[in-house]
Amino acid sequence: MHLSQLLACALLLTLLSLRPSEAKPGAPPKVPRTPPAEELAEPQAAGGGQKKGDKAPGGGGANLKGDRSRLLRDLRVDTKSRAAWARLLQEHPNARKYKGANKKGLSKGCFGLKLDRIGSMSGLGC
């Protein structure tokens, strides 16, 4: 296992082991939330009998828009953090490129990589 993967796993475990009440002692504990897709579906199902022009009693239409925008913002943050974790844990796409022969001081043959190519073309190699 690579060192970066090991560190990422350790960091993830420490973050998961913290509970919201431990992280912020002054904040009240959060209640379990339903998935955002279900939260978006519930207001639509509850207000299904109303038309677009109708307003909810008590000015609830503005609050509904605020709830939807908050939910969409939460979804965006979640996907950004997932993408960041995926990039962190993913192997570098050109990992072969950075291994072995491209390091200075390492040579594949008796005269070094460049001279070996010249020697193989001219027949002067070892």
UniProtKB/Swiss-Prot annotation:
Chain residues in the propeptide: 24-73
Cellular compartments annotated: Secreted
Gene Ontology CC, one term: secretory granule
PROSITE patterns documented for this protein: NATRIURETIC_PEPTIDE
GO molecular function: hormone activity; hormone receptor binding; signaling receptor binding
Cystine residue pairs: C110-C126
Endpoints of the signal sequence: 1-23
Any Pfam family: ANP
Positions of the UniProt region annotated as Disordered: 20-71
Residue ranges, compositional bias (Gly residues): 46-63
UniProt keyword annotations, A-Z: Cleavage on pair of basic residues, Disulfide bond, Hormone, Osteogenesis, Pharmaceutical, Secreted, Signal, Vasoactive
Extent of Pro residues compositional bias: 26-35
Family, per entry: Belongs to the natriuretic peptide family.
UniProt-recorded name of the protein: C-type natriuretic peptide
The organism of origin for this protein: Homo sapiens (Human)
